[in-house]
């Protein structure tokens, strides 16, 4: 039996450890804090699962696979982690990100619908569509309960044989395994500074109080204004997150207190897009972080000097939803069943693949 040590129990590490165990590997999963910790890029209450990624089919196809795997995990464990509420992209033009995404979804046979602005009024109790050219609607998209889903991957992995250990592991510790997978999220670049180029930036998220009419409304993304969120879920409130460039931070020492400027941005967007919520109170906040690669593609590659070590990460603010499908891809690469994609290689990155939920040009 082959052995693996997976360092990091965020969604990438937890899912990969579980996947390898299901394939018969002897797996140890090591985490310095706790699965689902707010310090990780996987920490938080909810994450959108959407298929649209511009014209990059690879991620759309993986999101489709991941959705099925999340639902299978939910059904197998009897633990609720998936909200099938759909998702709307608010399009400012007919030939932008949403149009490129629609072409990709059509190529892959993923359900989508282009709505005229007025038709989108039926999706929400209150919505301003005056600035929209249309709405790209993804009926099979939804929201994951992120922290619980991460913890569930660890728990289900343990049922499959994963040994979970609480410890801080560094490259100098030279962990023992036929394969060592470093899935360290926002810590990956600090562990391998000459190999990994990631920016770790803060992201302030706000939840606003709303009445029951907002329960179960679709998630939303606004690419041009770089905001995303969802309606009322599980008593959390209506989520609004500005997806704009944030300050670089240290995930170990960051004081997770939201900044007033970010609240102003979120509230301004909320009042403009959903007018009936203009005066809604803030009932919850989160401060998390992204681990951003230069082009927003993930990292999956061997260490150039340690052939048995793999570095995976660079979720770049769009990685969580892919969890179990990404783990299958990583496990295939580790087992030599599949070549890693060229755009996941270590080394310099150029440009922006436009895989996040906002335009920054």
Segments predicted by a language model, with ranges:
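Active-site substrate-recognition segment that forms the wall
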Residues: 18-23, 80-83, 184-305
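Short hydrophobic core segments
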Residues: 5-7, 30, 176-187, 327
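N-terminal Rossmann-like FAD-binding beta1-loop-alpha1 element of flavoenzymes
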Residues: 2-29
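Predominantly flavin-linked oxidoreductase catalytic cores and closely associated redox partners
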Residues: 144-213
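Glycine-rich FAD pyrophosphate-binding loop
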Residues: 22-42
